Amino acid sequence: MKSEVLSVKEKIGYGMGDAASHIIFDNVMLYMMFFYTDIFGIPAGFVGTMFLVARALDAISDPCMGLLADRTRSRWGKFRPWVLFGALPFGIVCVLAYSTPDLSMNGKMIYAAITYTLLTLLYTVVNIPYCALGGVITNDPTQRISLQSWRFVLATAGGMLSTVLMMPLVNLIGGDNKPLGFQGGIAVLSVVAFMMLAFCFFTTKERVEAPPTTTSMREDLRDIWQNDQWRIVGLLTIFNILAVCVRGGAMMYYVTWILGTPEVFVAFLTTYCVGNLIGSALAKPLTDWKCKVTIFWWTNALLAVISLAMFFVPMQASITMFVFIFVIGVLHQLVTPIQWVMMSDTVDYGEWCNGKRLTGISFAGTLFVLKLGLAFGGALIGWMLAYGGYDAAEKAQNSATISIIIALFTIVPAICYLLSAIIAKRYYSLTTHNLKTVMEQLAQGKRRCQQQFTSQEVQN
C-alpha cells in the first residue's frame, strides 16, 4: 500500500470512536463501584467478585470477536460495520446497568450481574473492531502515531466529558433522587456516545487490505501466541490498565474519605483530565524527538516514583495532591497513545514473521489481557474495601480502611508502572530503527525469523 497523509477530518472521526468508548468506559471505571455500593446498596465484596467474573467472561469473548471481525466481509469493510451496528444496543444496556429496580437484595445482585455482564460484552462488540480499525487505516508509522495522538486527545476529552459532567447531570436530573439522577445522566451520555460512533463510521476508511483468511481459528491463535512482541505488549497492557483501573476506582473513595472534601471531587477529576489532554498532545512531538520505546519506559519509571511519593503526602495537603494528580495525568496519558501504536507494530511484526496479517485477533488478544487486568483491578478494590470493613453508611471509616484506600490510590499503581518500565526496557525490541527495517522488508515481500531482534539493544 502506498502511504498517504491522513486528513484531519479522518483523524477526528477515528478519535470520536474512542471518545464514545471512553464516555462509557471511564464512567463505569470511576463511578460503577460507588454506584453499586452507595446507590444500589450492594455489598462491596459481592461487587468485587462480580467484576472479576463478568470481566473474565468478557475477556474470553475478545478473541472470538477478533476472529469474527477478521473474517467479516462487507461493502463497509471488516471492522467499521461493527462500530456502527453495535452502538445502539451498547447504549441501551448501559442505561439498564445504571438503573435501580425495586428488588430484594438477591434480586439486585442478580440484576446487576446480568446487566453488567451484558454491558461488558457489548463493549467488546464495538471496541475490538474499533481498535483493529486503527491498524488498517494506515500502515505508515508516522501517520499511526499522529492518528493515535488525535485518538487519545479526543478519547481523553470524551472521558473528561463523561466523568466531569456525570455528577452535575445526576444532580440536575435527579436532585435528591440519586438513582434517577444516575440513570438519567448515563442516558444523556449514551446518546452522545452513539452519535460519536456513527460519526466515526462515516468518516474513516479501511486501506490496509489483507488476503481472505483461509486458516483455522486455532492456527490464528497459535500464530498470535508465537509473536513474542505481542506477548510483551499484552503484559504491558495488564500493568497499565491495573494502574489506571485501581487508581480510578479508588479516586472517589480517596477524595471522600482521605481528602475529606467530596465536594471537590469534580475539580480533582478535572485536574487529572486536563493533564490527560496535555499528555496526549505531547506524544507525537516527543516521539518525533526520541524513540517511542525510550519515551515509554522512562515515563513509566517516572510515574512509579511520583505514585510512590504520593503515599507520603499528609492527608490534609489537598493542594499538593492536586499538583500530583495533574502531573500523573500528563505522564499517564503520554504513554497511552504510544502503547496503542506498539500494538499496531506487533501486527506488522507478526506479518513479517509468518506472512499473516491478523489485525482483528491481535487487538482482540490484547484487549483480552486488558479485560483480565480490569477484572483483577475491579475485584481488588472491592475485596480490599470489604477486608478493611468499609461501610458506606458510616460517617467515618476505620484506620484499616483508610490505609487501604491510600494504598490503592498510590502504592498499587506505583508497582504497576515500575514493572512496565522494566519490561519495556528489557524485552520490547520494536524500536523506531527496527520497525523501519520490518516495514521496508514487508514492502519488498521479504520475511525474517522471529528472533532477529530479540538480542538487540533499544536504539534511541
Curated annotation (Swiss-Prot):
<keyword id="KW-0812">Transmembrane</keyword>
<keyword id="KW-1133">Transmembrane helix</keyword>
<keyword id="KW-0472">Membrane</keyword>
<dbReference type="InterPro" id="IPR001927">
    <property type="entry name" value="Na/Gal_symport"/>
</dbReference>
<feature type="topological domain" description="Periplasmic">
    <location>
        <position position="310"/>
    </location>
</feature>
<feature type="transmembrane region" description="Helical">
    <location>
        <begin position="182"/>
        <end position="202"/>
    </location>
</feature>
<feature type="transmembrane region" description="Helical">
    <location>
        <begin position="117"/>
        <end position="137"/>
    </location>
</feature>
<feature type="topological domain" description="Periplasmic">
    <location>
        <begin position="203"/>
        <end position="248"/>
    </location>
</feature>
<feature type="topological domain" description="Cytoplasmic">
    <location>
        <begin position="174"/>
        <end position="181"/>
    </location>
</feature>
<feature type="topological domain" description="Cytoplasmic">
    <location>
        <begin position="270"/>
        <end position="288"/>
    </location>
</feature>
<keyword id="KW-0769">Symport</keyword>
<comment type="similarity">
    <text>Belongs to the sodium:galactoside symporter (TC 2.A.2) family.</text>
</comment>
<feature type="transmembrane region" description="Helical">
    <location>
        <begin position="153"/>
        <end position="173"/>
    </location>
</feature>
<feature type="topological domain" description="Periplasmic">
    <location>
        <begin position="138"/>
        <end position="152"/>
    </location>
</feature>
<feature type="transmembrane region" description="Helical">
    <location>
        <begin position="12"/>
        <end position="32"/>
    </location>
</feature>
<dbReference type="GO" id="GO:0005886">
    <property type="term" value="C:plasma membrane"/>
</dbReference>
<feature type="topological domain" description="Cytoplasmic">
    <location>
        <begin position="425"/>
        <end position="460"/>
    </location>
</feature>
<dbReference type="GO" id="GO:0006814">
    <property type="term" value="P:sodium ion transport"/>
</dbReference>
<feature type="topological domain" description="Periplasmic">
    <location>
        <begin position="388"/>
        <end position="403"/>
    </location>
</feature>
<feature type="topological domain" description="Periplasmic">
    <location>
        <begin position="54"/>
        <end position="80"/>
    </location>
</feature>
<dbReference type="GO" id="GO:0008643">
    <property type="term" value="P:carbohydrate transport"/>
</dbReference>
<feature type="transmembrane region" description="Helical">
    <location>
        <begin position="289"/>
        <end position="309"/>
    </location>
</feature>
<keyword id="KW-0813">Transport</keyword>
<feature type="transmembrane region" description="Helical">
    <location>
        <begin position="367"/>
        <end position="387"/>
    </location>
</feature>
<dbReference type="GO" id="GO:0015293">
    <property type="term" value="F:symporter activity"/>
</dbReference>
<feature type="topological domain" description="Cytoplasmic">
    <location>
        <begin position="332"/>
        <end position="366"/>
    </location>
</feature>
<keyword id="KW-0997">Cell inner membrane</keyword>
<feature type="transmembrane region" description="Helical">
    <location>
        <begin position="33"/>
        <end position="53"/>
    </location>
</feature>
<keyword id="KW-1003">Cell membrane</keyword>
<feature type="topological domain" description="Cytoplasmic">
    <location>
        <begin position="102"/>
        <end position="116"/>
    </location>
</feature>
<dbReference type="InterPro" id="IPR018043">
    <property type="entry name" value="Na/Gal_symport_CS"/>
</dbReference>
<dbReference type="GO" id="GO:0055085">
    <property type="term" value="P:transmembrane transport"/>
</dbReference>
<dbReference type="InterPro" id="IPR039672">
    <property type="entry name" value="MFS_2"/>
</dbReference>
<feature type="transmembrane region" description="Helical">
    <location>
        <begin position="81"/>
        <end position="101"/>
    </location>
</feature>
<feature type="transmembrane region" description="Helical">
    <location>
        <begin position="404"/>
        <end position="424"/>
    </location>
</feature>
<feature type="transmembrane region" description="Helical">
    <location>
        <begin position="249"/>
        <end position="269"/>
    </location>
</feature>
<protein>
    <recommendedName>
        <fullName>Inner membrane symporter YicJ</fullName>
    </recommendedName>
</protein>
<dbReference type="Pfam" id="PF13347">
    <property type="entry name" value="MFS_2"/>
</dbReference>
<feature type="transmembrane region" description="Helical">
    <location>
        <begin position="311"/>
        <end position="331"/>
    </location>
</feature>
<dbReference type="InterPro" id="IPR036259">
    <property type="entry name" value="MFS_trans_sf"/>
</dbReference>
<feature type="topological domain" description="Periplasmic">
    <location>
        <begin position="1"/>
        <end position="11"/>
    </location>
</feature>
